[in-house]
Amino acid sequence: TCDFGDLILHVVKILEKNNDISDIYSQNFKYILVDEYQDTNFIQSKWLNLLAEKNNNICCVGDDDQSIYSWRGAEIKNFLEFDKNYENTKIVRLEKNYRSTQNILSVASELISKNENRVGKTLFTDGEEGEYVYLDSYRTGKDEAIGVSDKIEKLKTKFKLNNISILVRAIFQTREFEERFLKIGMPYRIIGGTKFYERAEIKDC
């Protein structure tokens, strides 16, 4: 049996051993576009090199600061050394941000600047400077839920609850917040998921 990685590996072997086949495919793809290039591994990069060999028209989009999949084989080196592997590379930096305030961008830039192995960029916006960014830390998820709910209680004197949001990395992280909100009677809704106690596996318990 073959998994997805094996399929690409066997394709690369075929292209490397058979010049005629390699020529057909590299000539067939006049332009190659790749997204999330920072997440490619060694064999995927090799495959792209073979496909782009004749026309050398390849456009790769990615963000070195979002390279989080090294644990599954992603090679940030593919991204960092792209201009060395392809002649006449033109690098276009997408640094203008349309979503966040400048204060958020400045904090994010300061944190990520500590990363090693990055091209580097300066994020900016034409929008407002925005509110200051505050950082609170908690010992447990329960403590965090209490702290956040206390802040919401203060904020709701100035803002409507539907203008206040909590962003989480994964849906399982909502549980502590939901339990806290249910306890104090604070209304809430989950966007992009299902409330913890309404999930089928929880109802079945």
Regions found by a protein language model. Name each.
Residues 4, 8, 44, 145, ...:
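Short runs of predominantly hydrophobic/aromatic residues within well-ordered alpha helices
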Residues 46-49, 73-77, 107-108, 179-183, ...:
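Short, glycine/charged-enriched secondary-structure capping and boundary segments
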Residues 1-81, 96-100:
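Conserved helicase NTPase motor core
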Residues 10, 47, 78, 144-154, ...:
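Well-ordered alpha-helical segments embedded in enzymatic catalytic cores
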Residues 87-90, 95-188:
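Helicase P-loop NTPase motor core
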Residues 131, 182-186, 194-205:
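Conserved short internal alpha-helix adjacent to the catalytic or cofactor-binding core
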